[in-house]
Curated annotation (Swiss-Prot):
Role of this protein: Ribosome-binding protein involved in ribosome hibernation: associates with translationally inactive ribosomes and stabilizes the nonrotated conformation of the 80S ribosome, thereby promoting ribosome preservation and storage.
Ranges in a coiled coil: 41-83
One GO cellular component term noted in the UniProt record for this chain: cytoplasm
InterPro entries associated with the record: Ccdc124/Oxs1, Ccdc124/Oxs1_C
Name this protein carries in UniProt: Coiled-coil domain-containing protein 124-B
Keywords: Coiled coil, Cytoplasm, Cytoskeleton
Alphabetical GO biological process terms: transcription by RNA polymerase II
Residues covered by region (Disordered): 1-123
Subunit structure: Associates with translationally inactive ribosomes in the nonrotated state.
Length: 217
């Protein structure tokens, strides 16, 4: 009998040992699963936290960039107000329509009749302006004086076109105001044509004087 009792105790101890071992294995497995779940949740939390951090940094950089752009535009506007642009402005392009409009305005202004001068604006005595010659200056008060002064010297005889121009200028200064008074409605171009016709047959024209001298001989 004692031997049989001892055998039963040994079997019970072995069964308890196996049961305890199985429990230990099960506990270890549950613990590992719990730890894995914890770390998995923690990883998700870390990822979300890192993502929020990245989004926050991105927004901060965007805000900083907008501030820099606003400051740049403000500085540029201040510079323009002071008359100092930050960079040279590109030359503006002129369209064909603008060119034609400008030419049309100039043509209308040119053809507009000139306002006749009053008796207060016309000088009582015409003075011929000083004519600059090659070797000095002369002053003439009449057309004859201007022609005589410009005709002196062999050097001047080599340039008849200068004497012609001076004589015509003196003729124009005297006769143009008279033509404007007589023809107040004429345009300037018409007055110049009329003056030219008068000049071609005027005795004050050096060419007419030359022919008159030739015919007198």
């Amino acid at each position: 009998m004692p031997k049989k009792f001892q055998s039963e105790n040994t079997k019970s101890a072995a069964a308890r040992a196996r049961k305890a071992e199985a429990k230990a294995v099960a506990d270890a497995k549950r613990k590992k699963e719990t730890e894995d779940a914890f770390w998995q949740d923690d990883d998700k939390h870390v990822v979300r936290k890192e993502h929020r951090k990245e989004e926050k940094e991105k927004k901060r950089l965007e805000l900083l960039e907008r501030k820099k752009e606003s400051q740049r535009l403000l500085d540029e506007e201040d510079s323009k107000m002071k008359g100092k642009p930050t960079k040279p402005a590109a030359p503006s392009k002129v369209t064909r329509a603008q060119i034609e409009e400008t030419l049309c305005k100039e043509e209308k202004h040119k053809d507009a009749p000139e306002k006749p001068k009053t008796h207060l604006e016309i000088p009582l005595e015409e003075n011929v302006n000083r004519r600059v010659l090659e070797e000095g200056e002369v002053e003439a008060r009449t057309v004859e004086d201007a022609i005589a002064a410009l005709s002196i010297g062999k050097e001047l005889d080599r340039h008849p076109e200068r004497r012609m121009k001076a004589a015509f200028t003196a003729f124009e200064e005297i006769n143009m105001p008279l033509l404007k008074q007589e023809n107040p409605n004429m345009r300037l171009s018409q007055l110049k044509q009329l003056l030219k016709k008068e000049w071609m047959k005027s005795p004050e024209n050096p060419m007419n004087q030359k022919y008159a001298t030739y015919n007198s001989h």
